[in-house]
Amino acid sequence: MAKVRAPFEIIGTLDDLTFYKSSGQNLVREKGKPGITKEQFATSEIFIPIKKHGIEYGYCSLKSRVFRLLAKQFYDRAKEVSFAGRVNKLLFEILEEDTLNQRGERKLEIGLQIPALDEILLHFEANKLRPLDKVCYKNITFDWHENTINLNSINVDKDINWPEVEANRIHFQLAIANWNCKEDAFENHYSNEIILERSNAESLLEFQLNKLQTKDLW
C-alpha cells in the first residue's frame, strides 16, 4: 500500500494497481494475487482429502440433528453454547472407527459397532460446564436391567456441589434413549421429576421410567 501525492485524486484501477480513498487519503495498492479457482479445486488431486473430509463432516452434522433430540429437555436447560459443535466432533470420532469403508464413504452405523463405544458415549457431557461428576460427589451409574440408577437416596446438602450459597433447590430426573442413526429415528423416555429442598437429611429417590422398546446401540 502506498499514498498518492498529487494535485488531483485518482480512483479506479490501472494495470496491477488499485487507487482508492480511505480516511480522507488517496491510497494505492497492488491487486491481490488470484487464489485457487473453482475448476482447480474440482479437478486437482491435491484437494481430494479436503473434499472427503468435508463430505464426512457434513454427514455427521446432519446426523447430529437427531442425536441432539435424544434428551432435548436436558440439553435445553443446560444452554451450553458449544454443545452442537461437540456433538459433531463426537460423531466424527465414531465415524473414524469405520475401517470397512474408505474415507469419504464411512458410515456411523459401522463405527457404532466398536467395543469401545460405551467408553466414548458415557464420557460425553452435554453440559461441560457442570458435568455430573462435578455436581454429585457420589458415583452414579445406570442399571439397564433394573431401569434405574444405583442411588435410592441422597443427602443433597452433603452429596451435591451447589453452584452458589443462595441455591436451595435441586431437580432430579432421568432420561434414556435409543438412536437408530441409519434411519434417523430415536426413542426416548423421561422419568418423573423429583424436586428437593436443600437440607441435611437423607431423601428418597424414587423414579418411574418406562423401558425402551428398541435397542440399536447395544
Regions found by a protein language model. Give the residues of each.
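Charged linear interaction tracts used for macromolecular binding and regulation
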Residues: E93-W218
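Long, polar/Ser/Thr-enriched low-complexity segments
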Residues: M1-K128
